[in-house]
Swiss-Prot record:
Cell location: Cytoplasm
N-terminal signal peptide: none
Compositional bias per record (Basic residues), positions renumbered to this chain: 1083-1092
Matches recorded under CDD domains: RRM3_MRN1 (cd12521)
InterPro entries hit by this protein: Cwc2/Slt11, mRNA-bd_dom, Nucleotide-bd_a/b_plait_sf, RBD_domain_sf, RNA-binding_domain_put, RRM_dom
Note: Present with 1540 molecules/cell in log phase SD medium.
Compositional bias annotation for Polar residues: 1057-1081
Residues where N-acetylserine is found: 2
Naturally occurring in which organism (per UniProt): Saccharomyces cerevisiae (strain ATCC 204508 / S288c)
PROSITE patterns assigned to the protein according to its UniProt record, in alphabetical order: RRM
Taxonomic lineage of the native organism: Eukaryota, Fungi, Dikarya, Ascomycota, Saccharomycotina
Residues found modified as Phosphoserine: 464, 467
GO molecular function: mRNA 3'-UTR binding; mRNA binding
This protein's name: RNA-binding protein NAB6
Length: 1134
């Protein structure tokens, strides 16, 4: 281990300390994150730890490292390796982070000593565990002041606490409440007013993007330039943290005569804001040089620090050594940045505050009667940049009749002045005071320095956590005498050592986002490495009021349109609780804690799913109880961001439309404008341009954005859409009228009793229908043109209603209010009656008619941008109802298929595809219908006898199949050929005597019955060697000759549409229904001769059809072979 007094790498040490402090501040705004405890010097001091933090929604907390871990001492100093180890000491959980500070600890400049005889902590506490723990977190520095931070016992519901302001308290519901401590509670205002602000800044090297900070120094500015004019014209004031003038600069272009010019030091809230301002200057450098009256304008990035000696709580102590004092100054600078960050992030603090007065205040009485403490004769600390005094007769929605807007040089001044006003408001006659944000009245495109930054919480939410300096007193040797200064003016200091600590330890310039607590490690390492060994000059500056002009008081008789209340201030009752401090801890981290019952252990289910009731889990969660307010705020932020990114001003409602066709009218332009109701339309036909002003700024932003998605074409010209001049705030009269439905459209209609058919039988219908009528369109235009220009009159064909569209909504409001105005009239009998203005104006033409607001068609939604049938971007979207219809259609289709299958099974079998024809013959008087032309037949005489007796059936071989008469002649002619074929293919007649021909599957009852009948007939013929006589005398079956050439030309059987059938009805089919008469068979033969009405079948059915074809070919081949064998058996002697 190295000696504790040895020098440490300054840059690496500053980087490590910054990571710790960034992590702690990130957890301040994260309600789901807990930070582990690091025990310092055995006193249980609560502070940043090298241990990684864990989240409560993780399955298990991280196990704290021990000295026996290999990487335990990687990030600790040698003197800290064994401190806080649970194996060396077993600290008490309750007293571990509430123990009193050790007597040997050096007092910090930002921490008052805890004693019973001082005036800073007058309330003594007998329990030493509840005294100050010595650590001030950034989030509670200004809130807690110099009071001790106590951690109370969690084992009881009623928490015992100190009575000092800012301490941990609980309300009736058990939730913690923290009251922000006023800095003027413990210090005299007269003493603080004589202590000016002081800053230190170092000019960083140029030529490298790594040296970019949030502070910029503008050199060689003319002495006549006013600071307020620069900020007003070039910078959005709510993005500035501070702005200072530096006297005594020497002009570079003057060699002989030393001419003193000014330098302006501007510090922004974020580094991004500063870079935007810097790039804007470079793009318009000539314009800036002309405005600032400087041809040798120079820009430099600087590292800005606040001197902790200007703190309200700073105490000079002779007991502190020089090194300890330097360390206290270093830490005090960090605490100023931390407290400033806290107020900006949680209170939306700005450089401007508003003071409301109960009565009108004259310009001369502002500093004499109301703000005496800001008079320059008594005040050296708070310097004003501008003052706006407003005295009106009517209050606005946000402000009263009498108020003043004060803008200071930096935000810290505004914070302290606001504390003073809140404490002495009764004596000063002040009703309210709060932060406000200022925006330029008219921001030109050339002077808009922060085009991509919008007002509101977006800038403050990107505020970064300030860096942390070395806390060890030994490291203060690196800074030697850097902070020694001369309070009377500006002193240049030479830093002979590395400034790694100065850049990251003394500065709040390296700010990281609250939303992302991850620092830019690569940039930090690179910058720290580059600055090692580089000597830079540091400048000490006292903010002296003599260097600034006396602020001019601008009086106004109307409300300021560029002043807006801070969003957090508007919802102050919802964000009354500050971030709790010290941070609540989870006691799972301490394995050897003997007093586990004193703390509340978070159950496993709460770790996985945090409960919104537990204050430990929800530390600073901002929840808006009103969803409407939250939605409006979100819409405003989004529209403001889009407008800023598109080059518009915040709240601009005017749209420019160019490239209009000469034959287009104002009516045509309104037909293509969609997205929001309009306030006015200003059409200039000579210039072919038009300016359209919406009621709401988000509507204008939406229309502007939609014009790029869906370009507008009017009369063949594609319209150019841009931003018009800033329209200013919406007048209060119009905003109130819009809430009750006002628009540019006014309708004039007959009463419903005069034209609706449902009242045709009403007695009033006939009377009103005959007496009331609408004037024609020309008369309407002549009468209502007195209120303003008319864009369009839409007159219905049935003449019971019409709509008048004005060019300005104010004209419509005036018309409706005047026509519906009622006055009291007293008749001769003394009765008082109400009389409407419509009965007297325009000759009584509108008496009895209804006149009210209609619907502005410009407020309709652009149908081209929604999923509809009329949209060019229409895409068919399947809805649940569509799926239901599909399922119903599919079910109906399946039912139809089942019905068709059942009908198909009811039809008789078609044997024609197998080469077998079934013909029914009836005996009409005898005669030979068939002749057995089989030469050499043993029983030829018997066949002839049977033919003569009416058995007109010809047998075919030993199969006993009847030959139809139509095929006898063809069979006779081919007999010789068949004999040759059969003799070659068959051996003996006995081999085929017992062969059964299976025509269908035995599993089918109907087809099994058919095949069984045929088999029995065949076996009878074969065994008896004679033809078979069918039992049915009236109907005979003739089977055609088996000609393989003709049978193979038949269409093969089609595969069934499915592999499963329902044959419940087929079993009931009688045997005689299988064979129909000749007429039916002939008709069926014509219908089923070909494949008609093909349909798509699945793959399984295709395979079944293929198998059926193979079976058909095999069957035909077997039938031919069997036929040859049977015929061969009939001639055994041959």
């Amino acid at each position: 281990m190295s000696n504790s007094n040895s020098k440490k790498p300054v840059a690496n040490y500053a980087y490590r300390q910054q990571q710790d402090y960034n992590g702690m501040n990130a957890m301040v705004g994260n309600p789901m994150m807990y930070h582990p405890v690091d025990f310092v010097n055995g006193a249980g001091q609560y502070g940043p730890s090298q241990h990684p933090a864990y989240y409560t929604n993780s399955p298990l907390p991280n196990i704290p490292p021990t000295p026996f871990d290999t990487a335990y001492g990687a990030s600790l100093f040698p003197s800290h390796l064994l401190m806080g180890s649970p194996f060396v000491s077993s600290p008490n959980m309750q007293s571990g982070y509430n123990s009193a500070r050790s007597s040997n600890l050096k007092r910090k400049a930002y921490s008052r000593p805890v004693s019973n005889h001082n005036g800073y902590n007058g309330n003594s506490n007998s329990n030493q565990n509840n005294t100050n723990n010595g650590m001030v977190t950034p989030s509670n520095y200004y809130r807690m002041g110099r009071n001790s931070f106590s951690r109370n016992n969690n084992s009881t519901r009623n928490v015992t606490h100190n009575n000092n302001k800012g301490c941990d308290t609980r309300n009736n519901s058990g939730r913690r409440t923290f009251a922000r401590n006023n800095i003027f509670d413990d210090i005299l205002p007269e003493m603080l007013l004589q202590r000016p602000f002081c800053i230190n800044y170092k000019v960083l090297p140029t030529g490298d993007d790594a040296y970019r900070t949030r502070s910029l120094l503008i050199e060689n500015v003319d002495h006549s330039i006013d600071l307020h004019s620069i900020v007003k014209n070039f910078v959005k004031s709510n993005t500035l943290e501070s702005a200072y003038l530096i006297e005594g600069g020497k002009s570079d272009d003057s060699k002989d005569v030393e001419t003193k010019n000014l330098s302006i030091l501007i510090s922004f809230l974020t580094k991004g804001d500063c870079l935007n301002f810097y790039n804007n200057i470079l793009q318009r450098l000539s314009e800036f040089k002309t405005f600032l009256k400087s041809e040798a304008l120079n820009l430099k990035f600087v590292c800005l620090n606040y001197d902790p000696k200007c703190l309200p709580t700073f105490i000079e102590s002779e007991a502190l050594t020089e090194n300890a004092e330097e360390a206290d100054i270093t830490n005090g600078s960090t605490m100023i940045s931390a407290s400033l960050h806290h107020n900006i992030a949680n209170k939306d603090a700005t450089r401007s505050i508003i003071i409301e007065f109960k009565s009108p205040v004259e310009k001369s009485d502002l500093f004499k009667k109301k703000l005496q403490f800001l008079d320059r004769s008594k005040n050296k600390r708070y310097i004003l940049e501008s003052i706006d005094l407003v005295n009106t007769d009517v209050p606005s929605n946000q402000f009263p009749e009498n108020y003043a807007v004060l803008t200071f040089l930096n935000i810290s001044m505004a914070i302290e002045v606001l504390d003073y006003l809140k404490k002495y408001s009764k004596n000063l006659g002040i009703s309210k005071c709060f932060y406000v944000s200022l925006a330029p009245l008219v921001v030109s495109s050339a002077r808009s320095s922060v085009a991509n930054i919008y007002e509101g919480k977006t800038s403050t939410h990107r505020l970064s956590v300030p860096s942390v300096t070395a806390g060890n007193n030994n490291d203060s040797n690196n800074n030697g005498n850097n902070n020694k200064s001369n309070m009377s003016g500006i002193t240049t200091l030479n830093n002979n050592s590395s400034i790694g600590v100065s850049v990251y330890g003394h500065s709040n310039m390296s700010l990281t986002s609250l939303s992302s607590s991850v620092s830019l490690n690569e940039e930090i390492d690179m910058l720290a490495t580059k600055l090692q060994g580089v000597e830079l000059d540091g400048t000490y500056l006292e903010i002296n009021y003599r260097d600034y002009q006396t602020p001019t008081i601008e009086e106004h008789s109307t409300h300021l349109s560029n002043v807006k209340i801070s969003k957090t201030t508007e919802n102050s009752r919802q964000f009354s609780q500050d971030i709790p401090s010290p941070l609540p801890l989870n006691e799972h981290m301490f394995m050897n804690d003997s007093n586990q019952s004193n703390g509340a252990i978070i159950p496993q289910q709460l770790i996985a799913t945090p409960s919104p009731v537990s204050p430990n889990l929800q530390m600073n969660q901002r929840v808006l109880p009103n969803p409407i307010t939250q939605s409006l705020e979100q819409n405003f932020n989004v529209s403001a961001k889009v407008a800023s990114s598109m080059g518009s001003d915040i709240g601009n409602r005017t749209i420019y439309i160019g490239n209009i066709n000469p034959r287009s009218k104002a009516e045509d332009i309104c037909n293509v404008v969609r997205g929001g109701i309009l306030q006015s339309i200003k059409y200039i036909p000579e210039k072919k341009i038009c300016f359209v002003t919406f009621i709401e700024a988000p509507s204008a932003v939406q229309f502007y954005a939609n014009s790029f998605i869906d370009p507008i074409v009017l009369h063949g010209n594609m319209l150019r859409v841009g931003w018009g001049h800033y329209s200013g705030p919406l007048p209060k009269l119009i905003s109130l009228a819009v809430t009750i439905g006002a628009s540019r459209n006014v309708y004039v209609s007959l009463p419903e009793f005069a034209f609706k058919e449902k009242f045709i039988h009403d007695p009033q219908y006939k009377k009103l229908h005959e007496t009331l009528s609408l004037p024609d369109a020309e008369q309407l235009r002549e009468d209502f043109s007195t209120y303003g220009d008319i864009e369009q009159i839409n007159y219905l064909s049935d003449s019971h209603c019409c709509w008048i569209n004005f060019m300005n909504i104010s004209s419509a409001i005036s018309l409706v209010e005047e026509m519906n105005k009622e006055s009291t009239v007293q008749n001769e009998s003394g009765e008082v009656t109400l009389k409407r203005a419509t009965e007297e104006k325009f000759g009584g033409r509108y008496k009895g008619l209804l006149i009210n607001y209609g619907k502005d068609r410009c407020g309709n939604i652009n149908k081209n941008l929604i999923a509809g049938k009329n949209s060019r971007f229409y895409k068919k979207v399947k809805r649940p109802s569509y799926n239901i219809r599909l399922s119903k259609l599919e079910e109906k289709r399946r039912q139809n298929e089942i019905d068709e299958k059942e009908k198909a099974f009811d039809k008789p079998l078609n044997l024609e595809s197998l080469g077998i024809s079934l013909d029914a013959h009836k005996d009409n008087g005898g005669g030979e219908t068939g002749t057995a032309n089989n030469t050499g037949h043993e029983n030829e005489s018997e066949l002839e006898a049977e033919n003569e007796n009416g058995n007109e059936t010809g047998s075919f071989g030993g199969l006993g199949l009847a030959v139809a008469s139509s095929d006898v002649k063809r069979a006779t002619s081919d007999e010789t050929d068949y004999e040759d074929i059969f003799n070659k293919s068959s051996g003996s007649s006995d081999s085929s005597s017992d062969v059964e021909v299976i025509m269908h599957s035995p599993s089918d009852p109907e087809y099994a019955l058919k095949s069984q009948t045929l088999r029995s007939s065949s076996q009878t013929v074969i065994n008896s060697k004679r033809p078979v006589k069918i039992e049915d005398e009236e109907e005979a079956v003739g089977m055609s000759q088996l000609n393989y050439r003709s049978s193979l030309r038949q269409a093969p059987p089609r595969a069934p549409s499915t592999l499963s059938y329902n044959h419940s009805k087929n079993n009931e089919t009688p045997m005689q229904d299988i064979f129909t008469n000749g007429e039916t068979a002939n008709n069926r033969k014509k219908k089923r001769g070909s494949f008609a009405r093909h349909r798509t079948i699945p793959g399984s059915d295709v395979m079944a059809q293929y198998l059926a074809q193979v079976q058909h070919s095999t069957f035909m081949y077997a039938a031919n072979i069997l036929g040859a064998s049977a015929e061969d058996n009939t001639h055994p002697d041959e």
